[in-house]
Amino acid sequence: MPRRRIISTRKILPDPKFSSELLAKFINILMVDGKKSIAEVIVYTALKNLSERTEKKELEAFEIALENVRPTVEVKSRRVGGSTYQVPVEVRPVRRNALAMRWIVDSARKRGDKSMALRLSNELYDAVENKGTSVKKKEEVHKMAEANKAFAHYRW
């Protein structure tokens, strides 16, 4: 618990093309070494490719992909007595989005396609189709929480 005043979360400026705060956050997560314009080009190219493949609007397809990767529960380590338990806890909405975006970007970076825009586009398409590495990561986290359901009463 903080001893000083609680610091409010900073408002993020929406992205210039779609005026979406969610997409702006995604661009910031993708950004490397402060090169935001390059990250924007990569994301917009990937979204354009994605919308062509799914026949949906760019932002709509992005939201569907994000929804399919968002985790609802995760496990946190909790020390009780001499042993550590993996306790399943519900994920807060802000963290849900952050985890989903991070997993999509990490999975895209690990792919072996030619350009980052293509890798990101393919990963987002896989997420829309409910397959791919990022969706597998979400299912893995859910499985872990399900396996440790017995320790749910240790929640804090």
UniProtKB/Swiss-Prot annotation:
**Keywords, in A-Z order:** Ribonucleoprotein, Ribosomal protein, RNA-binding, rRNA-binding, tRNA-binding
- The reply on keyword tRNA-binding is yes
Q: Per its UniProt record, what CDD domains does this chain match?
A: uS7_Bacteria (cd14869)
Q: Which GO terms describe its molecular function?
A: rRNA binding; structural constituent of ribosome; tRNA binding
Q: Which SUPFAM superfamilies match?
A: Ribosomal protein S7
Task: Look up the record and give one Gene Ontology term from the biological process aspect.
Answer: translation
* One Pfam family in the UniProt entry: Ribosomal_S7
InterPro entries listed in its UniProt record: Ribosomal_uS7 (IPR000235), Ribosomal_uS7_bac/org-type (IPR005717), Ribosomal_uS7_CS (IPR020606), Ribosomal_uS7_dom (IPR023798), Ribosomal_uS7_dom_sf (IPR036823)
Q: Name one GO cellular component term.
A: small ribosomal subunit
Q: Which family does it belong to?
A: Belongs to the universal ribosomal protein uS7 family.
Q: Can you state the subunit structure given in the record?
A: Part of the 30S ribosomal subunit. Contacts proteins S9 and S11.
Instruction: Say what the protein does.
Output: One of the primary rRNA binding proteins, it binds directly to 16S rRNA where it nucleates assembly of the head domain of the 30S subunit. Is located at the subunit interface close to the decoding center, probably blocks exit of the E-site tRNA.
Name of the protein in its database record: Small ribosomal subunit protein uS7
Q: Which organism is it from?
A: Buchnera aphidicola subsp. Schizaphis graminum (strain Sg)
Source species taxonomy: Bacteria, Pseudomonadati, Pseudomonadota, Gammaproteobacteria, Enterobacterales
